């Protein structure tokens, strides 16, 4: 029994440290230093939570920028079902899905003259991406401007405003948060797109 006492004491100490002290300390530090991020990076408009800056949403109306396709089962951008399609690059079903997305994108964006950006035709590993490259957002500008009856230059300026650049180029590439951009479009016009 004497040999078990140090083992139980060590177990109890580590249980309190890793199960109590460490989680409380990291939660407190997160709330103190990064309160917005620690609480889910929620976007509030008119005292209502409109979404998270970290999770994409399904925007399908012509007056909205469309994000990457979601691979989540049943409901697009369902955070409870996060994950990719798990289809191999050699799987004919994946090729068929991409071809169908490209055809739908071309039909929805007849003003776009260049090739469909890859990230608009392929789902991400999480299925919840909220960001696009500035090029993929720019590809959609003519459709959004026409649907909202706004000058192309004004929509392009809004895309430029919502392009987030990393502190240094080796830390990543510029991205456009589609949720924030679409909410800014609504705020610009004072209503939701049809």
From Swiss-Prot:
Part of the high-affinity ATP-driven potassium transport (or Kdp) system, which catalyzes the hydrolysis of ATP coupled with the electrogenic transport of potassium into the cytoplasm. This subunit acts as a catalytic chaperone that increases the ATP-binding affinity of the ATP-hydrolyzing subunit KdpB by the formation of a transient KdpB/KdpC/ATP ternary complex. Keywords: ATP-binding, Cell inner membrane, Cell membrane, Ion transport, Membrane, Nucleotide-binding, Potassium, Potassium transport, Transmembrane, Transmembrane helix, Transport. The keyword Transmembrane applies. It comes from the Bacteria. PANTHER family: POTASSIUM-TRANSPORTING ATPASE C CHAIN (PTHR30042), POTASSIUM-TRANSPORTING ATPASE KDPC SUBUNIT (PTHR30042:SF2). The lineage of its organism: Bacteria, Pseudomonadati, Pseudomonadota, Gammaproteobacteria, Enterobacterales. GO terms for molecular function: ATP binding; P-type potassium transmembrane transporter activity. It comes from Salmonella heidelberg (strain SL476). This is Potassium-transporting ATPase KdpC subunit. One of its GO terms (cellular component) is plasma membrane.
């Amino acid at each position: 029994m004497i040999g078990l006492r140090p083992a139980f004491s060590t177990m109890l100490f580590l249980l309190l440290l890793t199960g109590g002290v460490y989680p409380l300390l990291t939660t407190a530090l997160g709330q103190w230093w990064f309160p917005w991020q620690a609480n889910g990076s929620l976007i509030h408009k008119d005292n209502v939570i409109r979404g998270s800056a970290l999770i994409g949403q399904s925007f399908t109306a012509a007056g909205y920028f469309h994000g990457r396709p979601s691979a989540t089962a049943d409901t697009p951008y369902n955070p409870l079902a996060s994950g990719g399609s798990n289809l191999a690059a050699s799987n004919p079903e994946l090729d068929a899905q991409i071809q169908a997305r490209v055809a739908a994108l071309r039909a929805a964006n007849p003003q776009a003259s260049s090739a469909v950006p890859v990230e608009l035709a392929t789902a991400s590993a999480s299925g919840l991406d909220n960001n696009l490259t500035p090029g993929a957002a720019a590809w959609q500008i003519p459709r959004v401007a026409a649907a909202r009856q706004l000058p192309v230059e004004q929509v392009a300026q809004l895309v430029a405003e919502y392009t987030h650049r990393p502190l240094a180029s080796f830390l990543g590439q510029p991205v456009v948060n589609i949720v924030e951009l679409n909410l800014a479009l609504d705020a610009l016009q004072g209503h939701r797109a049809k």
